[in-house]
Amino acid sequence: MSNKEEHVDETSASGVKEVSSIAARHDNGYAPSLITSTSGMDSFQSHALLNDPTLIEDYSDIINNRPTSGSKLTLGNEDSESMGGSVVVTPTSNKSSPFNSKLNILSNAAEKGHDVLRNRDDDKELEEENVEKHMHSNSKRDQRHYKENSSELPDSYDYSDSEFEDNLERRLQEIETDSVDSADKDEVHFSVNNTMNPDVDDFSDGLKYAISEDEDEEENYSDDDDFDRKFQDSGFQGEKDDLEEENDDYQPLSPPRELDPDKLYALYAFNGHDSSHCQLGQDEPCILLNDQDAYWWLVKRITDGKIGFAPAEILETFPERLARLNCWKNENMSSQSVASSDSKDDSISSGNKNQSDAESIIPTPALNGYGKGNKSVSFNDVVGYADRFIDDAIEDTSLDSNDDGGEGNGQSYDDDVDNDKETKVTHRDEYTEAKLNFGKFQDDDTSDVVSDVSFSTSLNTPLNVKKVRRQDNKNESEPKTSSSKDREDDYNANRYVGQEKSEPVDSDYDTDLKKVFEAPRMPFANGMAKSDSQNSLSTIGEFSPSSSEWTNESPSTPIVEESSSIPSSRAIKDISQYIHAKSKIEETTNVENTEGQIQASLGSSGGMANQTDAEQPKEELEKHHSTPEEEKQSTLSLHSSSEEDFYMDEQRAVSSASINSSLSGSRALSNTNMSDPASKPNSLVQHLYAPVFDRMDVLMKQLDEIIRK
């Protein structure tokens, strides 16, 4: 301990040489044994190495700035304060890596030892072996000494011998210089170094790794890139294969080949693992049994009749299947049209360039452009159509004509002969016009919509409306009434539906009539109770006076005296559509008058009635309607002359006396009110209702006679 204090006091005065000699007399003797007995070098070389200013550093600045006696450093072992020339003191921490200190040693010693290493003798290898042996023995003592110092001091220091550092530096420099000179020598020295002690090998390997760390990083960059590229290529290849397999699974489905409303079809194959599942193949049909659950439907497989559950999302219903078929057809047709247009454009462009060559090489197809023209729609009863007949040879031109049986108004033949080196194609077009006959219904505008209230639509006659009316030529020669020409056409259009079936009908006149508005006949209307409502089933489609509630054929309703008029709109429409011509009405009235006279001759009480019946019906109706017209003027405003003329007496009498009294009163009132134009009845109404009232009078007279008897 006294030697160390003397060394510290005399360091600044005696120099580096005296410090090294004092350190050589240290009790432990680590450095002297390393220098004198183990180095194997002569004294000259050892003194040259120790006194070389490039290898020995001056620690005067450290000695001057050493800590005071009261600092924490002096509290521990005083050996830590000794600064020998051959000892390098480096403070370390528990977290410091040994490679960092070794890198610092290499960086300082690499530049200073080039000249010394180049002047060495040939016995360098032997010396290195001796040094390695002593290093192995001394390393154990260093470790033991380090443990003792670390136990005594709280802050331990790393001690490294200068001779050991020099030997290590020489070895590393030899490796570097030999690697620069030739790679072979580098391999030899590296193999010799591998024969060293395992501890030294580990240490040298760590230093070697620290030196070549930067170079390895640069090389690793390229190696890592190559490895990553290979890994990515292999990984992406696998992912690519997986994606291709998934794309194969979700390829667009083929168009449906079977359509059945009662079946379901599997869009994709279903392989259920549960026993309750029904396994289905792609496009396999099945029958739906229960669809109450939104996710699993109970189905029955058609192939073997197995019943089980299948996911509803893979089952395709009939509307969905039909929609998919339509989509496929639309896409297919659009793609074909685009391809055909492109090919047509290409052929046209090529034909414009080499027209002569194209005509000789490319044959014109026989049906080129057939069916691509504009399609027309005809709304009349004459249909024109064309048939194209293709012959294999020019001689075979005789083909059957139209098999439809229609009237051929005109036929035109268009023969096109396509000359080719091998084949000759001939075709001809036959145009035909035919008139369509659909029985008594000559209009094809019937609606296919079926009403919800109809129960048996097959037996009902469809409602047929003619949009164009043809004017009758026979009625033009007959005398016209005071009404307009349009109203006269309406007279000739229909017959009065209230007449009996036994009434004689003129055949010539019947052929000239044309049905304009015909209501369907219900097959179950005979057994149905009549209803007063206009919206009931019994009155749907009946546009005739028989549907009116104010005639004898309507159901009996309580007679109300307050109602002095009938519904105007419906009555006017119904009556205006079923009015007779003047000639027919006069003919029927004459027949009824003769029948009334024959029946009236049976009783004496009906004599006066027979005289009134013999009079003209025009005068009778004027007298009969004069009184109601005066009552109507007091209660209602004058809407129109036709509406006032349709007034009917609601209080129908039950005896002939009441009828005769009303007729007699009407005669008296008609004479006073003939000058009033509003009270004058219309001639059309007289012709319409005169036969009805006459027959009613005759019937009432017969009833009176029966009662009297």
From Swiss-Prot:
PROSITE patterns: SH3 (PS50002). Coiled coil: none annotated. Disulfide bonds: none annotated. GO terms for cellular component: cell tip; cellular bud neck; cellular bud tip; cytoplasm; incipient cellular bud site; Kelch-containing formin regulatory complex; microtubule cytoskeleton; nucleus. The modification Phosphothreonine is found at residue 177. Residues 212-226, 396-406 have a biased composition (Acidic residues). The keyword Cell division applies. Residues 111-123, 131-150, 470-504, 615-633 have a biased composition (Basic and acidic residues). SMART domains: SH3. Present with 538 molecules/cell in log phase SD medium. Important for bud site selection. Seems to be a regulatory subunit of the BUD14-GLC7 type-I phosphatase complex. The BUD14-GLC7 complex is necessary to regulate microtubule dynamics at the cortex and may function as a specific activator of the dynein complex. This is Bud site selection protein 14. It comes from Saccharomyces cerevisiae (strain ATCC 204508 / S288c). The gene is BUD14.
